[in-house]
Amino acid sequence: MFQATTIIAVRKGQQTAIAGDGQVTLGQNTIMKQNATKIRRLYEGKVIAGFAGAVADAFTLFAKFEEKLKQAGGNLSKAAVEIAREWRSDRILRRLEALLIVADAEKIFIVSGSGELIEPDDGIAAIGSGGAYALAAARALNAFSELNAREIAVESLKIASGICVYTNEQISVEVIEK
């Protein structure tokens, strides 16, 4: 499991949002930074991505993923399959320690270096040390509130930050509208 962050993606109605907390933790007990941005817009702003894991590894993966998006003409599904395949098979890439959540207006995927490519059934996905808490909160908020995707993502991270010591309330969020 990758500690020191929580990333949540929510698709609801005409909106897809990815949100992440800002905490960077060194080791088990030192907070190094409170307001890091772990969410990026890619491919002319049509795709959003978030990472959990080593920062340098995440930047490498963002660059590789954007390259795959360009090669696929912006097709998120195809680019996600290609980055998962390359990540797993490349000797250098497979040593990278990170997870990605990538999304466009239609789909959300979790991508890992071991070859997993997961599209959630309910349009909600989370990664990182507080991921399970944020996921549970987002599912409840989605089912029992009228909040939009952005609001669900932010509120679920706030809930996770009250439980997970590696997650804080310095939240950044990116939204794509259909």
UniProtKB/Swiss-Prot annotation:
Keyword hit for DNA repair: no
EC number of this enzyme: 3.4.25.2
Stored PROSITE patterns: PROTEASOME_BETA_2
Main location, first listed in the record: cytoplasm
An individual GO BP term: proteolysis involved in protein catabolic process
Transmembrane segment boundaries: none
Residues that bind Na(+): 161, 164, 167
Molecular function via GO: metal ion binding; threonine-type endopeptidase activity
Active site, per annotation: 5
Source superkingdom: Bacteria
Activity regulation comment: Allosterically activated by HslU binding.
Subcellular location: Cytoplasm
Annotated keywords: Allosteric enzyme, Cytoplasm, Hydrolase, Metal-binding, Protease, Sodium, Threonine protease
Catalytic function, reaction form: ATP-dependent cleavage of peptide bonds with broad specificity
Complex formation: A double ring-shaped homohexamer of HslV is capped on each side by a ring-shaped HslU homohexamer. The assembly of the HslU/HslV complex is dependent on binding of ATP.
Family in the record: Belongs to the peptidase T1B family. HslV subfamily.
Known role: Protease subunit of a proteasome-like degradation complex believed to be a general protein degrading machinery.
Protein name as it appears in the record: ATP-dependent protease subunit HslV
Annotated source species: Syntrophomonas wolfei subsp. wolfei (strain DSM 2245B / Goettingen)
